[in-house]
Amino acid sequence: MDMLSAAEQRTLEQRMQKRQVKEFMGAFGGLVEHCFMSCVDDFTSKAISNRESGCINRCVQKWMASQQRISDRFQEHNAQLTAQMNK
C-alpha cells in the first residue's frame, strides 16, 4: 500500500469499506432469513409469540457466538502466518 499515491489509497480504502458493508449486509440478511424461517411459523397474528421471540433470540445468540469464534480462529491463523513470515 506504500507504493500507492494518496488518491489511489483513498480509492482502495473506499472500495474496501464498500465491500465490508456489502459483506455485512449479506451476512445480516442471511441471519434474518435463517432465524425467521427457523423460528416464525404462526402467521395468524401480527405479533411474534413468546416462543418465536425466544427462538429468534437463541438463533441470533448462536450466530453471534459462531461469528466470534470464526473471527478468533481467523486472527489466530493470521498471527501464525505472520510469525512464520517473520522467521
Curated annotation (Swiss-Prot):
UniProt keyword list: Chaperone, Disulfide bond, Membrane, Metal-binding, Mitochondrion, Mitochondrion inner membrane, Protein transport, Translocation, Transport, Zinc
Principal place of residence: mitochondrion
What cystine linkages occur within this chain?
A: C35-C59, C39-C55
* A GO cellular-component term linked to this record: mitochondrial inner membrane
Location comes to:
Mitochondrion inner membrane
Q: Which InterPro entries match?
A: Mito_inner_translocase_sub, Tim10-like, Tim10-like_dom_sf
What are the BP-aspect GO terms? protein transport
What positions carry the motif Twin CX3C motif? 35-59
Q: How does it sit in the membrane?
A: Peripheral membrane protein
Q: Which domain of life is it from?
A: Eukaryota
Q: Which SUPFAM superfamilies match?
A: Tim10-like
Q: Which GO terms describe its molecular function?
A: metal ion binding
Q: Which Pfam families match?
A: zf-Tim10_DDP (PF02953)
Q: How does it assemble?
A: Heterohexamer; composed of 3 copies of TIM9 and 3 copies of TIM10, named soluble 70 kDa complex. Associates with the TIM22 complex, whose core is composed of TIM22 and TIM54. Interacts with the transmembrane regions of multi-pass transmembrane proteins in transit.
**Record-stated family:** Belongs to the small Tim family.
Q: Which PANTHER family match?
A: MITOCHONDRIAL IMPORT INNER MEMBRANE TRANSLOCASE SUBUNIT TIM9B
> What free text does the record give on domains?
The twin CX3C motif contains 4 conserved Cys residues that form 2 disulfide bonds in the mitochondrial intermembrane space. However, during the transit of TIM9 from cytoplasm into mitochondrion, the Cys residues probably coordinate zinc, thereby preventing folding and allowing its transfer across mitochondrial outer membrane.
Q: What's the protein called, per UniProt? A: Mitochondrial import inner membrane translocase subunit TIM9
- What would be the name of the gene that encodes this protein? TIM9
